[in-house]
């Protein structure tokens, strides 16, 4: 007989609903609300041929409208001229000869006017293409060339057929590429001097390969001495539309055609470009600073270049001019710092110093002996506030807008401590834990040095390279001398349970903070403010393409004397609201591949950001880690090679992803491209934490109990740093248990067994404050 499995004894199965009645289902779900169903998901909408044709037609119409709006300022007889800069990349290139060939290609029989080669500009009207052109031919000087490229609609790079691009020419190309450049054309000079046709083609291919390395859209190199090629260049200049520079076109700027000066007022004539010119915004003049607009007047349209000299105090510059617009009560102030806070009780040095002298700090608490209770860190409160009232004062909310799109890195090292910041130069006091200060690295000079000087520079270079190598191999490690007290050397340091989760109050009272730190401007949401200023439409009379007179007030006579020379180019850049206010600016920085010397934190560099230049000493740090719940950034002593980090300085705020370039000045006043990047954020709540790692040697090991030596050299230091967590290079963690003897030996317990080959370490952290920038003035170019 076949085996038969018995049935289950459970006859009633209430969880089965196969035969449930309607009434039972209603009873079961009577208190539930049926979810809203918007319809079936994943509906595939099939578009017809007419729909696709209509969509393409709308896209095409939008593009045509956009191009027409952008070309409007260049159209017509009185349209704004297109600005074209001719950049010679070799010593034997004559820019005026190239300009002559371009103009003769339009009409070979026409007589050209005599050029004023002392002038930087030449204006002309091309009747054949009904276009006004303004050629800029700056001298082969660094600042003149890059400033002209910055304001140009087209840049023509001219190479030589018989000479290679020198180091200076390559620096110009890399700088213009880094700062942002509009449309680019490439030409070759003296191609007729090459004998055979085959060699000419090889030269053109080689030069095109060179230009394609920097600008991939360069499909051809035109010959300047070939009439047809020159005509093609002129046709491209007159009929095409320039690509533009995003950061420049999002602001208003004006290229001067005429300047006059009287009684502290500077009158500049030019055509408004970019966005409309708002009289309530400040004007930046490169190399001199920010100035306020007094009034804006109408000017006749058309090309006009002259230098008006009017220095009599009784002369009225604006006599007979029609006022277009003037500033209101909402005009931006020239003050770059906030008001001094004098209602806060800052007499806390003794209290904080008393707490700091009783124990080490772990996160936001000072840890004393076991019989004492930990005391919270002191806060800044208004004068007359009692202890009970102070507990009701909430801490400020931390900024929620954190950037997390930058790589997280690991290398950090010791550096000098900041004490005070003056309005121009920060006063630095070197901690006892600092190594000997290293002079700035010298660039290679093209003159023979003395044997002693060569030896000195070589030793200096090797020393800096050795420090960088040690930094990469043993990050943050410091050594204590046997006669040195750790609690004194690391008095300003604290312990952190985790660099990614431990909180650090950025607004706590710190006796070591700079004097102007509380006057820096803070913004609740930088991203929203940036979008507001960059996307808001312009409402006013000084629209793009309109010729105007701009009157600036309280202008020094030195500006007129400098820019009244025909070879100097004056450009007025309008700043967005708040862009003259000082704050903690943060931007990405990556060392340039051609710059091989180590770049140290606080090393003086020339920073160019948009139209402004500053002398800065940035602090390098990792960005706040992605997903981290705090505002900590790990400090770097050196700018890590081939790695993007955050550079922090106290400078005026910038709105938008503006490119930055940093240069290193050498002893012969030449510049080397050191680093590039872009503006990221302004954030005074970010804490740059410098880490110091104390290391010790396992002397005796008994399972998880280890005797450690050479980390401290007296029992008082062991007791002082007892709350700080220990870790090993192999991943174990532990805590100090008790000191042993009088030479700094101590017992420690770990979460696992360690070996005598392992290294025991302890991390301590100190806050670093960014240093202020200095405006790079025109007078500093030759100094």
Curated annotation (Swiss-Prot):
<dbReference type="GO" id="GO:0005634">
    <property type="term" value="C:nucleus"/>
</dbReference>
<comment type="similarity">
    <text>Belongs to the TRAFAC class translation factor GTPase superfamily. Bms1-like GTPase family. TSR1 subfamily.</text>
</comment>
<dbReference type="GO" id="GO:0000479">
    <property type="term" value="P:endonucleolytic cleavage of tricistronic rRNA transcript (SSU-rRNA, 5.8S rRNA, LSU-rRNA)"/>
</dbReference>
<dbReference type="InterPro" id="IPR012948">
    <property type="entry name" value="AARP2CN"/>
</dbReference>
<dbReference type="InterPro" id="IPR039761">
    <property type="entry name" value="Bms1/Tsr1"/>
</dbReference>
<feature type="compositionally biased region" description="Basic and acidic residues">
    <location>
        <begin position="24"/>
        <end position="37"/>
    </location>
</feature>
<dbReference type="Pfam" id="PF04950">
    <property type="entry name" value="RIBIOP_C"/>
</dbReference>
<keyword id="KW-0963">Cytoplasm</keyword>
<dbReference type="GO" id="GO:0034511">
    <property type="term" value="F:U3 snoRNA binding"/>
</dbReference>
<dbReference type="Pfam" id="PF22298">
    <property type="entry name" value="Tsr1_G-like"/>
</dbReference>
<feature type="region of interest" description="Disordered">
    <location>
        <begin position="1"/>
        <end position="56"/>
    </location>
</feature>
<dbReference type="GO" id="GO:0003924">
    <property type="term" value="F:GTPase activity"/>
</dbReference>
<dbReference type="InterPro" id="IPR007034">
    <property type="entry name" value="BMS1_TSR1_C"/>
</dbReference>
<keyword id="KW-0690">Ribosome biogenesis</keyword>
<feature type="compositionally biased region" description="Basic residues">
    <location>
        <begin position="1"/>
        <end position="21"/>
    </location>
</feature>
<dbReference type="GO" id="GO:0005525">
    <property type="term" value="F:GTP binding"/>
</dbReference>
<keyword id="KW-0539">Nucleus</keyword>
<dbReference type="Pfam" id="PF08142">
    <property type="entry name" value="AARP2CN"/>
</dbReference>
<dbReference type="GO" id="GO:0005730">
    <property type="term" value="C:nucleolus"/>
</dbReference>
<feature type="domain" description="Bms1-type G">
    <location>
        <begin position="80"/>
        <end position="243"/>
    </location>
</feature>
<dbReference type="GO" id="GO:0005737">
    <property type="term" value="C:cytoplasm"/>
</dbReference>
<dbReference type="InterPro" id="IPR030387">
    <property type="entry name" value="G_Bms1/Tsr1_dom"/>
</dbReference>
<protein>
    <recommendedName>
        <fullName>Ribosome biogenesis protein tsr1</fullName>
    </recommendedName>
</protein>
<comment type="function">
    <text>Required for 40S ribosomal subunit synthesis. Required for normal export of the pre-40S particles from the nucleus to the cytoplasm.</text>
</comment>
<dbReference type="GO" id="GO:0000462">
    <property type="term" value="P:maturation of SSU-rRNA from tricistronic rRNA transcript (SSU-rRNA, 5.8S rRNA, LSU-rRNA)"/>
</dbReference>
């Amino acid at each position: 007989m076949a085996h038969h499995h018995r049935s289950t004894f459970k006859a009633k199965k209430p969880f089965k609903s196969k035969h449930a009645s309607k009434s039972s289902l209603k009873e079961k779900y009577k208190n539930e609300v049926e979810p809203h169903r918007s319809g079936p998901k994943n509906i595939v909408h099939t578009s017809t041929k007419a729909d696709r044709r209509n969509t393409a037609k709308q896209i095409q119409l939008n593009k045509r409208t956009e191009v027409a709006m952008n070309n409007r300022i260049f159209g017509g007889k009185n349209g704004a001229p297109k600005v074209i800069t001719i950049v010679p990349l070799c010593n034997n290139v004559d820019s005026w000869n190239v300009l002559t060939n371009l103009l003769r290609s339009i009409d070979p029989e026409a007589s050209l006017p005599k050029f004023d080669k002392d002038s930087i500009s030449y204006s002309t009207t091309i009747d054949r293409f009904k276009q006004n052109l303004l050629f800029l031919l700056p001298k082969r000087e660094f600042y003149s060339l890059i400033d002209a490229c910055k304001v140009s609609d087209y840049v023509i790079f001219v190479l030589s057929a018989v000479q290679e691009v020198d180091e200076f020419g390559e620096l110009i190309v890399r700088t213009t590429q880094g700062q942002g450049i509009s449309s680019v054309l490439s030409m070759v000079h003296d191609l007729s001097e090459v004998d055979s046709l085959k060699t000419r083609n090889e030269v053109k291919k080689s030069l095109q390969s060179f230009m394609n390395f920097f600008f991939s859209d360069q499909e051809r190199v035109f010959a300047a001495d070939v009439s047809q090629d020159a005509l093609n260049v002129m046709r491209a200049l007159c009929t095409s539309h320039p690509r533009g520079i995003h950061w420049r076109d999002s602001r208003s700027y004006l290229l001067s055609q005429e300047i006059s000066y009287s009684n502290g007022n500077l009158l500049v004539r030019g055509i408004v470009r970019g966005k409309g010119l708002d009289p309530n915004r400040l004007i930046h003049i490169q190399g001199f600073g920010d100035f306020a607009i007094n009034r804006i007047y109408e000017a006749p349209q058309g090309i006009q270049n002259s230098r008006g000299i009017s220095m009599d105090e009784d002369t009225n510059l604006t006599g007979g001019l029609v006022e277009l617009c003037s500033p209101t009560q909402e005009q931006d102030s020239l003050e770059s710092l906030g008001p001094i806070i004098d209602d806060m009780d800052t007499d806390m040095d003794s209290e904080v110093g008393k707490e700091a002298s009783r124990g080490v700090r772990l996160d936001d608490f000072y840890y004393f002996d076991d019989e004492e209770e930990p005391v919270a860190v002191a806060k800044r409160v208004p004068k007359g506030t009692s202890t009970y009232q102070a507990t009701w004062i909430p801490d400020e909310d931390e900024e929620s807008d954190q950037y997390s799109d930058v790589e997280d890195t690991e290398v950090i090292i010791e550096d000098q401590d900041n004490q005070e910041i003056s309005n121009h130069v920060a006063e630095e006091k070197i901690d006892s834990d600092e190594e000997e200060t290293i002079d700035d690295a010298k660039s290679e000079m093209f003159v023979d040095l003395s044997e002693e000087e060569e030896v000195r520079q070589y030793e200096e270079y090797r020393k800096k390279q050795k420090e960088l190598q040690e930094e990469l191999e043993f990050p943050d490690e410091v050594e204590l001398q046997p006669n040195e007290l750790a609690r004194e050397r690391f008095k300003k340091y604290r312990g952190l349970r985790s660099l990614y989760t431990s909180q650090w109050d950025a607004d706590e009272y710190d006796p070591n903070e700079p004097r102007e730190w509380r006057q820096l401007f803070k913004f609740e949401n930088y991203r929203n403010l940036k979008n507001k200023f960059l996307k808001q439409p312009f409402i006013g009379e000084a629209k793009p393409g309109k010729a105007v007179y701009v009157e600036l007030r309280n202008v020094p006579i030195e500006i007129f004397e400098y820019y009244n020379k025909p070879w100097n180019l004056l450009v007025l850049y309008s700043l967005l609201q708040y862009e003259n206010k000082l704050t903690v600016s943060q931007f990405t920085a990556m060392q340039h591949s051609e710059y091989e010397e180590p770049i140290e934190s606080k090393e003086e560099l020339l920073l160019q950001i948009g139209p402004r230049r500053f002398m800065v000493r940035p602090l390098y740090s990792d960005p706040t880690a992605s997903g981290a719940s705090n505002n900590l950034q790990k400090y770097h002593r050196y700018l890590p090679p081939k790695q993007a980090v955050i550079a922090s300085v106290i400078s005026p705020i910038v709105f938008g992803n503006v490119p930055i370039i940093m240069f290193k000045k050498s002893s012969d006043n030449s510049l080397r491209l050191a680093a590039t990047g872009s503006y990221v954020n302004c954030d005074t709540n970010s804490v740059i934490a410098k880490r110091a790692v104390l290391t010790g040697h396992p002397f005796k090991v008994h399972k998880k109990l280890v005797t450690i030596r050479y980390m401290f050299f007296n029992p008082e230091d062991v007791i002082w740093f007892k709350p700080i967590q220990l870790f090993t290079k192999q991943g174990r963690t532990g805590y100090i248990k008790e000191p042993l003897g009088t030479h700094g030996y101590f017992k420690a317990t770990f979460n696992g067994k360690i070996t005598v080959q392992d290294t025991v370490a302890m991390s301590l952290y100190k806050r670093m404050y960014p240093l202020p920038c200095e405006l790079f003035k025109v007078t500093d170019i030759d100094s």
